[in-house]
Amino acid sequence: MPYEIKKVFASLPQVERGVSKILGGDPKGDHFLYTNGKCVILRNIDNPAIADIYTEHAHQVVVAKYAPSGFYIASGDISGKLRIWDTTQKEHLLKYEYQPFAGKIKDIAWTEDSKRIAVVGEGREKFGAVFLWDTGSSVGEITGHNKVINSVDIKQTRPYRLATGSDDNCAAFFEGPPFKFKFTIGDHSRFVNCVRFSPDGNRFATASADGQIFIYDGKTGEKVCALGESKAHDGGIYAISWSPDSTHLLSASGDKTSKIWDVNVNSVVSTFPMGSNVLDQQLGCLWQKDHLLSISLSGYINYLDKNNPSKPLRVIKGHSKSIQCLTVHRNGGKSYIYSGSHDGHINYWDSETGENDSFSGKGHTNQVSRMTVNESEQLVSCSMDDTVRYTNLTLRDYSGQGVVKLDVQPKCVAVGPGGYTVVVCIGQIVLLKDQKKCFSIDNPGYEPEVVAVHPGGDTVAVGGTDGNVRVYSILASTLKDEGKLLEAKGPVTDVAYSHDGAFLAVCDASKVVTVFSVADGYSENNVFYGHHAKIVCLAWSPDNEHFASGGMDMMVYVWTLSDPETKVKIQDAHRLHHVSSLAWLDEHTLVTTSHDASVKEWTITY
């Protein structure tokens, strides 16, 4: 096998303000799962760096839940499709697919024998359905609500009971199977966001945007108590999760705290303050074995510490929005990956362990378009917020100093020796020296798109939407057009010099990579065909003999310079999402990022 996946650094959950996010637990207690875009992400709870991504939904997935048997997962998307798929094999084969209603699926519940499934959401003609998992035959009706149903749960002991919570401020109670509506519960004054039965089936709890949690008898549906008497939280409550022994309840709220409740004596055991920023609102939670997890509005997953509520044991960071660019850098004997996303967030990853964090301080406020590392160990990034930032990679702290404000929006940045940085903006090429603007070409006569600086530092290649690459010289802090026009096969999407400076690779929107030989006056060396859609990124291997290209066809090719027929093809590198950026950690390790917000490492063998 010429390639194999080495590491997957998964995306964070996709979250929305004021909407609860469901974390699904694995009955064995080893994994947890959540959704982002069209992906379902399964992670090991003890070592979250171990992840698996399921990408077979055609639409955005909202919720995924393990069957109590642990052998299958049911996942539902915004179109109303429910897919039931195998968890035991890497291929995740589809077992059944149903369309219980047309509209967003918001929650899923299984009976303890893994034979029946309840699905709720915002359908057009009904808000819920309950059916047999293998035939799809109905085993009851979910009625009694006149607005979207947000949550459903089924008692895990016989006799079965089913409870729902809705935007009509009510919960509803059902007996079955076949499940029949018994009564509505009108104790809440705002949307009911979450209903959950305790594992032993004796009680169920409802949580609402009014900040209250009510406990009811699991068999009869009679009210037992309100947690915290009048109010459980100062803000809306988005999620609740029972402890495995059914005595305690974990709650997550918009008041930026999570709490553990002792349900038997109706008191708070611990309060976890998560911060003061709006991004610290808590939208989801999960209690699995000894692990207490919560999701913040930032998308971060917090491992809560019962012994020290003020500080989480660990926080899983990463990206929840599409990654636009990446670069790699060795620091203190370790290789780090830096990735920048659509929301301006830059994250750094230890390439071996997957340990990661974001820079401290206030950084870019809009999409990070391109990043590279200069000779003084600074990360140079350009963003749609019209700035170029220089960030010290030892301190990893955004400072107020290293920011250059530009007149127009930058699209690409490249660095060379001597403190030079070349920035391609909309209709402008800017030369910076030592973080100061020293020269610019306004109205170059074409639309520049991408830029690369020769390792020697004296030459700059700029690719344009007109399908040409122009070569400039850096002379005494100015850019001089050498009058050299290199023709690509279509609008240029990326340019890259090999590390020894001998070759320039150019990729274009016409699905072709052209390599020019620098020493022979930029004569055409070879042309590489294979992609089925626009190529968007290029990266040279440190051996200068191979280079990789990634495109909108979800494919990555690793090409051999001397022979275009000898290539490694990584099909579906990021399934259903196009590859956005590439970089090499060493001669045999390639890193790819994509709009699915994940980072992957591949081992390439020739």
Swiss-Prot record:
In its UniProt record, which GO terms are filed under biological process?
actin cytoskeleton organization; actin filament fragmentation; apical junction assembly; cortical cytoskeleton organization; establishment of planar polarity of follicular epithelium; maintenance of epithelial cell apical/basal polarity; neutrophil mediated immunity; neutrophil migration
The residue intervals holding the WD repeats read: 4-45, 48-87, 93-135, 138-176, 180-218, 224-263, 270-306, 311-351, 358-408, 432-474, 480-518, 523-561, 566-604
What this chain does, per the record?
Induces disassembly of actin filaments in conjunction with ADF/cofilin family proteins. Enhances cofilin-mediated actin severing. Involved in cytokinesis. Involved in chemotactic cell migration by restricting lamellipodial membrane protrusions. Involved in myocardium sarcomere organization. Required for cardiomyocyte growth at the postnatal and maintenance at the adult stage. Involved in neutrophil actin dynamics and migration. Involved in megakaryocyte maturation and platelet shedding.
Gene knockout outcome: Embryonic lethal. Partial deficiencies disrupt megakaryocyte maturation, platelet shedding and provoke neutrophilic autoinflammatory disease.
Q: Where in the cell is it found?
A: Cytoplasm, Cytoskeleton; Cell projection, Podosome
- Provide any one GO MF term from the record: actin binding
Q: Extract the SUPFAM superfamilies matched here.
A: Nitrous oxide reductase, N-terminal domain, TolB, C-terminal domain
Q: Which GO terms describe its cellular component?
A: actin cytoskeleton; cell projection; cell-cell junction; cytosol; glutamatergic synapse; myelin sheath; plasma membrane; podosome
Traced from the root, the source organism's taxonomic lineage reads: Eukaryota, Metazoa, Chordata, Craniata, Vertebrata
Q: Which family does it belong to?
A: Belongs to the WD repeat AIP1 family.
Which protein are we looking at?
Answer: WD repeat-containing protein 1
Q: Which organism is it from?
A: Mus musculus
Q: Where are the transmembrane segments?
A: none
What keywords are annotated for this sequence in UniProt?
Acetylation, Actin-binding, Cell junction, Cell projection, Cytoplasm, Cytoskeleton, Phosphoprotein, Repeat, WD repeat
Q: PTM Phosphotyrosine: list the residues.
A: Y238
Modification type N6-acetyllysine: residues: K28, K81, K95, K115, K480
